[in-house]
Amino acid sequence: GFPDWLVKKEKRGELALRTDDPEYLKYVDIFFTEIAEQADGYMHKDGGPVIGIQIENEYGHAGGPSDREEGMAHMHTLRAMAEEKGLTAPYYSATGWGGAYVPESFLPVLGGYVDAPWANHTHELAASENFLFQPFHDDANIASDFSEGQSGFTFDAAEFPYLTAELGG
């Protein structure tokens, strides 16, 4: 999430979060600078263990512009800003489920859970297919509390390996 003071700036109309708004990107630049300083020497290119970077989280599913083209462009903006700061890795990932934006050159990552504390009910959940051996998984129950989210994929699932960012037991 974002710090309260930044969310308040959006509520006052001073910036638009999770867009290419220059005022928002000013804070992204500061944030990426801090991360780059702390990650110095840990990137794969420097012999470190960091081989992947997730630029955004649930972007296009739970936040961000409703226009996919604008959302995809913003993801590329964030990646370029990260790379400019030295935050480079062999792999860049993006949330792949729920219509989240997965631009070209990003690996989609999915997730699955045994429980769904965000669900609007208390009845027993069906067993999750995410814990079975099969070629591809998409847990439709993840973030089912977000009605503004989009459904489906913004990438061709046949073109990518099955990777997870969230697999909770």
Positions of the model-derived regions?
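Alpha/beta-hydrolase active-site loop
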Residues: 30
